From Swiss-Prot:
Keywords: Activator, DNA-binding, Nucleus, Transcription, Transcription regulation. This is AP-1-like transcription factor YAP7. SUPFAM superfamilies: Leucine zipper domain (SSF57959). SMART domains: BRLZ. The lineage of its organism: Eukaryota, Fungi, Dikarya, Ascomycota, Saccharomycotina. GO terms for molecular function: DNA-binding transcription factor activity; sequence-specific DNA binding; transcription cis-regulatory region binding. Residues 74-94 have a biased composition (Polar residues). Residues 153-181 are annotated as: Leucine-zipper. Homodimer. One of 8 closely related fungi-specific YAP proteins (YAP1 to YAP8), which all seem to be transcription activators of the environmental stress response and metabolism control pathways and to have similar but not identical DNA binding specificities. Residues 95-114, 135-144 have a biased composition (Basic and acidic residues).
């Protein structure tokens, strides 16, 4: 014969949730034994009691994604805390060893200082004199560089002044040429206007033809008067005179 399986219905009534930094332990109670009839009394107290302290996640920085699992985060935190503890312990050990070494070195330095005070004073004086000499040399070199630089700049300035003077002379020469050409242009324009006005008069005047073979050396009227010589008297016959009368 088959055995009947008993089914137990459990009612859960959680308590109020509390917020805190530590997770609380879950307190559970064992369920009551199942009744042979399969009926459960719901009027009695709750069989399971849950109590859990919820922990709020830390506020994330902008641009970072939240972690998917809290278990991984807690494990990482535990591991990082362990690593930090180991590092701090190692640092403490290193500091103690360094302190011991420094104390030993100070002891040796004190002995060596006591032994070489005289030589140290001499070395200090030499180092001061050497430093002063180096400073004097550096200042002298700086002054020389400054004077050479000033000379170079003065030469450049003088060259630029000469160049400016040349361009000014060229400008004045071109300006005078421009003014002369402008005057000549105005004169030629005025002459052209006069010729245009006289053109219709020239066209309407009759054309006079000049002789084809003009004399090579034309004689002026004054020369003709000066070179004039009177002719001698001519005797006329009486019969001719009467006829004329």
């Amino acid at each position: 014969m088959r055995q009947r399986r008993s089914v137990v219905a459990v009612s859960v009534k959680p308590k109020g949730f509390k917020l805190g930094h530590k997770q609380g332990s879950m307190s559970t109670t064992s369920p009551p034994p199942s009744s042979p009839d399969g009926n459960v009394s719901t009027s009695g107290p709750s069989a399971i009691k849950l109590s859990k302290n919820w922990e709020l996640p830390q506020r994330l920085k902008p641009g970072r994604k939240p972690k998917s699992k809290r278990g991984d985060a807690s494990a990482n935190n535990d591991g990082s805390s362990k690593i930090k503890k180991v590092q701090t312990s190692n640092q403490k050990d290193q500091m103690t060893t360094k302190d011991h070494e420094n104390e030993g070195a100070k002891g040796h330095e004190g002995k060596s200082d006591d032994e070489g005070n005289g030589s140290g004073d001499e070395n200090g004086v030499d180092s001061v004199e050497k430093r002063r000499r180096q400073n004097r040399d550096a200042q002298r070199a700086y002054r020389e560089r400054r004077t050479t630089r000033i000379q170079v700049l003065e030469e450049k300035v003088e060259m630029l002044h000469n160049l400016v003077d040349d361009w000014q002379r060229k400008y004045k020469l071109l300006e005078s040429e421009f003014s002369d050409t402008k005057e000549n242009l105005q004169k030629s324009i005025a002459l052209n206007n006069e010729l245009q006005k006289a053109l219709p008069l020239i066209v309407n005047t009759p054309f006079q033809q000049q002789p084809e073979n003009p004399p090579d050396n034309p004689i002026s009227i004054l020369e003709m008067v000066e070179n004039f010589k009177p002719i001698g008297a001519v005797s006329l016959k009486k019969g001719k005179l009467k006829a004329h009368c």
